[in-house]
A protein has these predicted regions:
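Conserved donor-binding/catalytic core segment of Leloir-type glycosyltransferases
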Residues: 4, 216-234, 238-243, 256
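Donor nucleotide-sugar binding/catalytic pocket of nucleotide-sugar-dependent glycosyltransferases
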Residues: 150-213, 314
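A short, well-ordered alpha-helix in the C-terminal region of glycosyltransferases
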Residues: 252, 279, 351, 358, ...
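Nucleotide-activated donor-binding/catalytic signature segment of Leloir-type glycosyltransferases, i.e.
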Residues: 265-286
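Conserved acidic donor-binding segment of nucleotide-sugar-dependent glycosyltransferases
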Residues: 285, 337-338, 342-349, 358-364
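Short alpha-helical donor nucleotide-sugar binding micro-motif in glycosyltransferases
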Residues: 285, 292-299, 315-316
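Acidic donor-binding loop of glycosyltransferase active sites
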Residues: 294-307, 320-321
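Short acidic/histidine- and often glycine-rich active-site loop of Leloir-type glycosyltransferases
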Residues: 313-317, 327-338, 342-343
Length: 387
C-alpha cells in the first residue's frame, strides 16, 4: 500500500513516526514545499532533512486567491506516484475544495482521501458561538476572533470543511475531541481514527535509562519546569506570576524555564520586578537531548501555562506530573485531572498557583502522579501505538 502525505515540512517528531509506518509495511511518500511554508509550520519549529525510510517529494508553492498555500505540483506527483491513499491536512485540503481537477484526479484514480487535523479551533458545525468561549489568539496573544470578516471566514470554512469531510473516506486526528466535533460535519464515527501526537518515545525512554544512571547535573530542589519557545501565547508570564504567589512558602523551590524567544527580556524583567532573581532561572534553549533529559529528571513538576506541544509527552516520559490549562485538545488525552496532573483555569494565576502549591505540599502525590504519566506513555500513547 502506498500513502502520500502532504505537510508543510518534516518535523523532528514526525520523521521517526513515518519511519515506523514504513517498517510496518506501508510505502510512504511525503510531499512538502520546496521552501519552508510559514503558514503551516510555526516559527522556531525544528525541521529535519536527514536520511529516512520514507520518500520525500518537493513541490513548488504559491498563495491561492483565498490566502492559503497551494502545492502546485501535487497533481503531477499523484499522477506519478499513483498512491492508494492521499492524506491532506490544513491548509492543503482547501486545495481539494477549490481545485476541481484535483478532485477529479483523486476520484478517477480511485485514490482514497483522508483528512488529517487535530482538530484545533474547529467549532461544531454551525456554532459560531463557540468562539465566545474559545477565543482565537495569534502567537502574540492578539485576538483574532472579532469583527465581521472573521466570522464570515469562519462560516465559509465550516461549509468548506463539511464538503471536504463529505468526500473523505476517513479522518486522522490527534485528539479524541474529534469524536465530538466531526460528526456535526457529517463524518461517521467509524471513519474517525485518533492516532494522537507523539515524539520518539522509544528514544526518550532509552535515553531516560542513561539519565537515571548519570550523576546529578543540578542542585537538588523542588524544581518547577517549563520548556518551550518564549512567545506570548505560551503564557510564561502567567507562570511567573503564579510562582511569585507561592515561592515565599517554599524556599527550596525554583522555577526553571528552558527556551529562547522574543519574550526573553520581558520575562526576565518581570521576574526581577517581582523579586524573583535567583528563584526563576532562565536556562535558554537546550538542544542536547541528554541534558534536557537531566533537567526533566531532576524536576518535580512540569507546567504548561499556555499553548503547548509535545513537551507534555516528553515530561511524562520522565515521570513528571503535569499542570496545564485546556489548550489545543491534545492535552485531554494525556492528562487526567487528579490522576497524573491538574488543570487550572485558563489565564488565572491564582488557579495555577493553587495547583502548583498543592503538589509541592504533597510529594507522595507528585510521585504517584509521575508514575501514572510514565505508564500512560509506555502503554497508551507512544511511537508504536500511534503508527
Amino acid at each position: 500500500m502506498k500513502v502520500v502525505f502532504t505537510m508543510g515540512g518534516i518535523t523532528h517528531y514526525l520523521s521517526p513516526l513515518l519511519d515506523n509506518v514504513v517498517r510496518k509495511g506501508v510505502d510512504v511518500v511525503m510531499v512538502i514545499p520546496s521552501v519552508k511554508d510559514n503558514q503551516t509550520i510555526g516559527k522556531g519549529v525544528k525541521l529535519v532533512n536527514n536520511e529516512a525510510l520514507y520518500q520525500v517529494r518537493y513541490s513548488e508553492i504559491k498563495q491561492g486567491w483565498y490566502g492559503k498555500t497551494i502545492l502546485t505540483d501535487l497533481k503531477t506527483i499523484l499522477n506519478e506516484e499513483k498512491p492508494d491513499i492521499v492524506v491532506l491536512g490544513w491548509p492543503y485540503f482547501l486545495q481539494y475544495f477549490f481545485d476541481r481537477q484535483l478532485r477529479l484526479l483523486i476520484k478517477e484514480n480511485n485514490i482514497k482521501l483522508i483528512i488529517r487535523e487535530i482538530p484545533f479551533q474547529v467549532p461544531p458545525f454551525g456554532q459560531l458561538s463557540y468562539f465566545k468561549e474559545n477565543p482565537v489568539y495569534d502567537e502574540n496573544m492578539i485576538l483574532q476572533s472579532r469583527g465581521m470578516s472573521f466570522f464570515i471566514r469562519a462560516l465559509c470554512t465550516m461549509y468548506i470543511r463539511k464538503f471536504v469531510y463529505k468526500h473523505a473516506d476517513a479522518t486522522i486526528n490527534y485528539a479524541s475531541c474529534a469524536y465530538d466535533i466531526l460528526p456535526s460535519y457529517g463524518v461517521n464515527k467509524d471513519k474517525i481514527f485518533v492516532t494522537y501526537n507523539t515524539p520518539n518515545t522509544e528514544s526518550l525512554i532509552r535515553l531516560r535509562e542513561k539519565v537515571l544512571s548519570a550523576p546529578p547535573l543540578l542542585e537538588k530542589k523542588q524544581r518547577i519546569l517549563h520548556i518551550g519557545r518564549l512567545v506570548k501565547w505560551k503564557r510564561v508570564d502567567l507562570l511567573i506570576d503564579a510562582y511569585a504567589k507561592i515561592c515565599p512558602n517554599y524556599p527550596d523551590s525554583e522555577l526553571t524555564i528552558i527556551g529562547n524567544g522574543p519574550e526573553m527580556e520581558n520575562l526576565q524583567y518581570q521576574a526581577e520586578n517581582l523579586g524573583l532573581t535567583g528563584r526563576v532561572v532562565f536556562v535558554g534553549a537546550i538542544y542536547d537531548p541528554f541534558t534536557l533529559g537531566q533537567y526533566m529528571h531532576e524536576s518535580s513538576i512540569y507546567v504548561l501555562a499556555g499553548m503547548g506541544g509535545l513537551s507534555i509527552n516528553e515530561a511524562m516520559c520522565y515521570s513528571l506530573p503535569v499542570i496545564c490549562s485546556v489548550c489545543d485538545g491534545t492535552e485531554k488525552d494525556l492528562i487526567q485531572d487528579g490522576v497524573n496532573g491538574y488543570y487550572f483555569e485558563s489565564g488565572n494565576a491564582d488557579s495555577l498557583a493553587k495547583s502548583i502549591e498543592y503538589l509541592l505540599r504533597n510529594p507522595q502525590m507528585m510521585k504517584a502522579f509521575g508514575d501514572v504519566s510514565l505508564k500512560k506513555i509506555q502503554e497508551e500513547i507512544n511511537l508504536d501505538t500511534v503508527s
